[in-house]
């Protein structure tokens, strides 16, 4: 936690008033609507916690909400995540909501609000939507009331932090051969893109698509810390997700930046494939969905928007995704190599089901004795720079390495 969170909180009574306004006036108006999949004892405990809240018995409510969280946490961590019933995720969200509110009932310092925001984020990350996405609204109120953080200046026109991870390293920048370079077009008409790239499944870099996005001028380390620094996010730790020592952990964006970007950490940290813009709508206001997504079959709400934020040297191993992808580069540069789905045999996918969409080959240092066909497989490559939008067709194999401190936004669509 950064030092400024110990400062006295400004207007705690205003904070409580703003939070309380998000809830119904009476307990009877707040509907839990839990299904029979939730144990009767847990449903009873949650209703008791709710009653304690509306009676103003904050300490008792806090204890009850923590009991709800402990029990539902066990349910969330039993078996594969895909098998966790949504009802238990809703129970967890209710527990997070009540604990968050109790922590903010009479906070004396901003540390209490920062802890409340951490709990709220846990509900957003691990729970399911309740009461019209109330946790999103609570998080927005909490952020508004936290004092502005004092971060070192690091704007887009200033030098980035002087660490090895933030400097350009010419020796680490691969050569892109002209006849193997991804083609570039500047804002082609929709039908031209559809006919020549979408339908035949050909990669292309679209220039100018993101020029008008506010993030292209606003985003910097300082800005990201100011908007999202106190938010809890999942971070991948390790060089590649295929490595045995790879893991995931939860930390605030500030902690991530200080540990993995501003410092020389032993491991590589990567805020990867996270729906950050659903968690923090303030950042979503700085981006737009590319117009070309309208050529898809799905609705706009079905487009998955992910953030990819990390230091120089983060790697996404050669893999393929089932959906069309627009990868927009906002900060820094990335080296990307692409192989057609027709070359699947030559990239040697893992044989296990969980990694069947990932190649066994280390793209930039291949073991050709073990994978002899790989060197013969044709590919395209590029250096993706700020403002570039790369179209990666569905099931196209792609390998990504960041050459600088980097922030990318991906749009997966059908």
UniProtKB/Swiss-Prot annotation:
It is found in: Nucleus; Chromosome. Residues 269-414 form the JmjC domain. SMART domains: JmjC. Coiled coil: none annotated. 2-oxoglutarate binds at residues 270, 316, 319, 325, 334, 398, 412. InterPro entries: ARM_KDM8_N, Cupin_8, JmjC_dom. Its EC number is 1.14.11.73, 3.4.-.-. Can form homodimers (via JmjC domain). Found in a complex with RCCD1. Interacts (via N-terminus) with RCCD1 (via N-terminus); this interaction stimulates H3K36me3 and H3K36me2 demethylation. Interacts (via JmjC domain) with H3C1. Interacts with FBXL3 and PSMD2. Interacts with CRY1 in a FBXL3-dependent manner. This is Bifunctional peptidase and arginyl-hydroxylase JMJD5. It comes from Rattus norvegicus (Rat).
């Amino acid at each position: 936690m950064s030092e400024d969170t110990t400062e006295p909180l400004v207007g705690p009574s205003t904070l409580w008033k703003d939070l309380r306004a998000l809830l119904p006036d009476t307990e009877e108006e707040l509907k839990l609507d839990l299904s029979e999949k939730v144990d009767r004892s847990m449903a009873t405990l949650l209703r008791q916690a709710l009653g304690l809240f509306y009676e103003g018995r904050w300490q008792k409510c806090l204890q009850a909400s923590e009991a709800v969280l402990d029990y539902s946490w066990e349910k969330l961590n039993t078996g594969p995540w895909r098998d966790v019933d949504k009802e238990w995720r809703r129970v967890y969200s209710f527990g997070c909501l009540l604990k968050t509110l109790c922590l903010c009932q009479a906070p004396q310092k901003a540390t209490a609000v920062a802890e409340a925001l951490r709990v709220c984020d846990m509900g957003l990350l691990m729970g399911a939507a309740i009461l019209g996405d109330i946790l999103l609204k609570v998080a927005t109120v909490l952020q508004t009331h936290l004092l502005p953080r004092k971060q070192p200046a690091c704007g887009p026109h200033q030098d980035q932090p002087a660490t090895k991870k933030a400097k350009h390293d010419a020796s680490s920048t691969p050569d892109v051969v002209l006849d193997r370079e991804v083609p570039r077009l500047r804002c082609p008409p929709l039908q031209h893109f559809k006919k020549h790239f979408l339908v035949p499944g050909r990669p292309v870099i679209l220039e100018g698509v993101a020029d008008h996005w506010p993030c292209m001028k606003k985003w910097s380390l300082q800005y990201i810390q100011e908007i999202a620094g106190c938010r809890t996010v999942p971070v991948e730790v390790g060089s590649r997700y295929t490595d045995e020592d790879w893991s995931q952990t939860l930390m605030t964006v500030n902690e991530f930046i200080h540990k993995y970007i501003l410092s020389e950490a032993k491991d590589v940290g990567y805020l990867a494939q996270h729906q950050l813009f659903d968690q923090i709508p303030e950042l979503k206001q700085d981006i737009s969905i590319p117009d070309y997504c309208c050529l898809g079959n799905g609705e706009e709400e079905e487009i998955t928007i992910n953030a990819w934020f990390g230091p120089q040297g983060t790697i996404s191993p050669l893999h393929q995704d089932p959906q069309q992808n627009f990868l927009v580069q906002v900060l820094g540069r990335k080296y990307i190599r692409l192989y057609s789905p027709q070359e699947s045999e030559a990239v040697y996918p893992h044989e296990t089901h969980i990694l069947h969409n990932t190649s066994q080959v280390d793209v930039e240092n291949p073991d050709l004795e073990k994978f002899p066909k790989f060197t013969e497989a044709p590919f395209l490559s590029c250096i993706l720079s700020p403002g570039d939008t790369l179209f990666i067709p569905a099931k196209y194999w792609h390998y990504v390495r960041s050459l600088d401190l980097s922030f990318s936004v991906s749009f997966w669509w059908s």
